[in-house]
């Protein structure tokens, strides 16, 4: 099958936003106008095309990012609809990793909200160009220019309107195009009849003012345009569009559009902007990776002529076809039935069938080309973040960063029959979602699941019940603490056992130092002269890793520690891997006496919105919960408080806030970082864990 759309005419985009900004409805309208669906499904009626899991339709939020492909103006647009709820941040992160551009959807009444900040920060990390769609212009309190100001104030984004609304709330009836300087007036409810008119007289001054600001902002990103602008020459519409495209692709400028997806206004113009301003796979730098045979860096330009290279970014269990692996092709061509190499695992995989996805329906295709996003059936060993490549041209692409889970709970099957099924169900769910961890407590035999938040674990337990028919009892949520060392120290681990026959002998000296936050555990072998033979070095590292899984204070996993093995001794006959593993774990225990071990707790960035009269209550809540206020701002009659609060103190806060504000207050929280717990709290945690032992 020949390539249908050239790379220049391909767009891979994500739709990202805060929960309830109208993201799924926006995607629905895109599918409607591009001819993919014939009837529009409303999210609040549970009928949306993109929200296809049962829980999504019940809860009216998007949980898994469904991928779909559509056509607009002779271009192919591959769309990934990402969740806006903070507990599903990995879904956003992994889709951003494989996208070329994104549409950030705002609620025009609220502007930038907490989760908008999170996804914006992630998109900036991955260098993803964005356009902004200020949605819900028909909503009471909608304020387009306020929304634009929040992009500047909260995100420090160089964002400028390329459109202005005509009217707002019930009176929202059209859009001013600041490039063409024309008005688009909507005359029916489906948004299909649009009249292009002159800008209404009462909006002309404002339009000219914002057109001038737009031209100046774009000129500042381009030397040639700046010269023309300073010399007073007119910048043509074509030059302005080209300037916006270049600056947007370079992530120096963010065009802002407006509309109401629910009322079918502005979506086609937003689709035009996707084509006009977001990059094709040819506009972004070639993907980099490491050749596993040479350890050299290599690149793969977007071209069908290059060797095949793709990244698996999502695993899903489909009720009809089984395990689906979603992947983005960066270079080359792949045909169904062929073999590829999973370079991350060193395993050969056969591609059974290739499917092009449309929310929850699928079309079988026999070939995918560079720049495409598709799903494969039949891959057994591939997980999220793995590279799939041509067997003769190996490359390992940069993987996907997986955040650490912050909350855990115990699950136990209700019956013996459920026990076996639960193991299989949890394994499959963990394959799909790398932020979901399943562990067995060695001492109690209990199964502990960890994730990014209460809703995250709720949904997974719910899926276990519905999809795998497993009934389970669920314990109360617990915080996922971590442990670390705060001081450097040197420690000896010496293990010797003589009891007739072959003995055991292992002797190591290890220097422990605190590592940078987020760097995890790093091991260095600094042995000189073979005082510890080379074959025992991996056993020392393994002994440390195993011991650090159950830390030195309260049994929580240890993070961010460097260990340097610099001395030791061995016995010709009695030394073994086991002896050196035990010696390493003894060195860690010894180090704990002088390395100032500390317990770390997850700190959440909490954003609380309350009526002005409840501000005092909220400040009291934050202080009482060991939190610290980071900032406040007024928005209408409400106050927005941003604070860092330990997760351990936030359980049950929804009820407290509801009663303090008579149900008018709301809050959002997102994991931010780990921090040392105060000494008094640390002692409590240790006592509690010792008591349980």
Curated annotation (Swiss-Prot):
UniProt keyword annotation of Nucleotide-binding present: yes
Example of a GO cellular component annotation carried by this entry: cytoplasm
Protein residues bound to GTP: 17-24, 81-85, 135-138
Keyword GTP-binding among UniProt keywords: yes
MF-aspect GO terms: GTP binding; GTPase activity; translation elongation factor activity
Domain spans labelled tr-type G: 8-282
Gene3D superfamilies: 3.30.230.10, 3.30.70.240, Elongation Factor G (Translational Gtpase), domain 3, P-loop containing nucleotide triphosphate hydrolases, Translation factors
Organism domain of life: Bacteria
GO biological process, one term: ribosome disassembly
Task performed by this protein: Catalyzes the GTP-dependent ribosomal translocation step during translation elongation. During this step, the ribosome changes from the pre-translocational (PRE) to the post-translocational (POST) state as the newly formed A-site-bound peptidyl-tRNA and P-site-bound deacylated tRNA move to the P and E sites, respectively. Catalyzes the coordinated movement of the two tRNA molecules, the mRNA and conformational changes in the ribosome.
Name this protein carries in UniProt: Elongation factor G
Native organism: Streptococcus pneumoniae (strain Hungary19A-6)
């Amino acid at each position: 099958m020949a390539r249908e759309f050239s790379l220049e005419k391909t767009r891979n985009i994500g739709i990202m936003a805060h929960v309830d900004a109208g993201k799924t409805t926006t995607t629905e309208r895109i599918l409607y106008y591009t001819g993919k669906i014939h009837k529009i499904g409303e999210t609040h009626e549970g009928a949306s095309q993109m929200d296809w899991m049962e829980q999504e339709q019940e809860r009216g939020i998007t949980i898994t990012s469904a991928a779909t492909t559509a056509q607009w103006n002779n271009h192919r647009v591959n769309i990934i609809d990402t969740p806006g709820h903070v507990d599903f941040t990995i879904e956003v992160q992994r889709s951003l990793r494989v996208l070329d551009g994104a549409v950030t959807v705002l609620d025009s009444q609220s502007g930038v909200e907490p989760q908008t900040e999170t996804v914006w920060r992630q998109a900036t990390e991955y260098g993803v160009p964005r356009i902004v769609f200020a949605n819900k212009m028909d909503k009471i309190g909608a304020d387009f220019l306020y929304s634009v100001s929040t992009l500047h104030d909260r995100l420090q984004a160089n964002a400028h309107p390329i459109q202005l609304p005509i009217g707002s709330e019930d009176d929202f009836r059209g859009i001013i195009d600041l490039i063409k300087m024309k008005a688009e007036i909507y005359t029916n409810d489906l948004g299909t009849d649009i009249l292009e008119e002159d800008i209404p007289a009462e909006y002309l001054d404002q339009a000219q003012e914002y057109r001038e600001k737009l031209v100046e902002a774009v000129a500042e990103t381009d030397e040639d345009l700046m010269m023309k602008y300073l010399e007073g020459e007119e910048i043509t519409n074509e030059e302005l569009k080209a300037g916006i495209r270049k600056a947007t692709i370079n992530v120096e400028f963010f065009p802002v559009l407006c509309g109401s997806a629910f009322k079918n206004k502005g979506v086609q113009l937003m689709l035009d902007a996707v084509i006009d301003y977001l990059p094709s796979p040819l506009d972004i730098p070639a993907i980099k990776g490491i050749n596993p045979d040479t350890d050299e860096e290599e690149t793969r330009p977007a071209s069908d002529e290059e060797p095949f290279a793709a990244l698996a970014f999502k695993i899903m269990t489909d009720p009809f076809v089984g395990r689906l692996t979603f992947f983005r092709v960066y270079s080359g061509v792949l045909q169904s039935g062929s073999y590829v190499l999973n370079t991350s695992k060193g395993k050969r995989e056969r591609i059974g069938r290739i499917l092009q996805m449309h929310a929850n329906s699928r079309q079988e295709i026999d070939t995918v080309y560079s720049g495409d996003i598709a799903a494969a059936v039949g891959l057994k060993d591939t997980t999220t973040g793995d590279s799939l490549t041509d067997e003769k041209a190996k490359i390992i692409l940069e993987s996907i960063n997986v955040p650490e889970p912050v909350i855990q709970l115990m699950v136990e099957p209700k019956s013996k029959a459920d026990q076996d099924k639960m193991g299989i169900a949890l394994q499959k769910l963990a394959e799909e979602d790398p932020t979901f961890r399943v562990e067995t407590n060695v001492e109690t035999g209990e199964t502990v699941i960890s994730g990014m938040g209460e809703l995250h674990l709720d949904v997974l337990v719910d899926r276990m019940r519905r999809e795998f028919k497993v009934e389970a009892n669920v314990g109360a949520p617990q915080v996922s603490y971590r442990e670390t060392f705060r001081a450097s120290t040197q420690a000896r681990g010496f293990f010797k056992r003589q009891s007739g026959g072959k003995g055991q002998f292992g002797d190591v000296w290890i220097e422990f130092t605190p590592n940078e936050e987020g760097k995890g555990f790093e091991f260095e072998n600094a042995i000189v002269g073979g005082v510890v033979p080379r074959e025992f070095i991996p056993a020392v590292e393994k002994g440390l890793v195993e011991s650090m899984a159950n830390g030195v204070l309260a049994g929580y996993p240890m993070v961010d520690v460097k260990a340097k093995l610099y001395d030791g001794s061995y016995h010709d006959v009695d030394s073994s891997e086991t002896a050196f593993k035990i010696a390493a774990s003894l060195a860690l225990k010894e180090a704990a006496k002088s390395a100032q071990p500390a317990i770390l707790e997850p700190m959440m960035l909490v954003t609380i919105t309350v009526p002005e009269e409840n501000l005092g209550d909220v400040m009291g809540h934050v202080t009482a919960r060991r939190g610290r206020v980071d900032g406040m701002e007024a928005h209408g009659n409400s106050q927005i408080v941003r604070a860092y609060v330990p997760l351990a103190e936030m359980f049950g806060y929804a009820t407290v806030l509801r009663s303090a504000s008579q149900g008018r207050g709301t809050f959002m929280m997102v994991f931010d970082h780990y921090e040392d717990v105060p000494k008094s709290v640390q002692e409590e945690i240790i006592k509690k864990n010792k008591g349980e032992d």
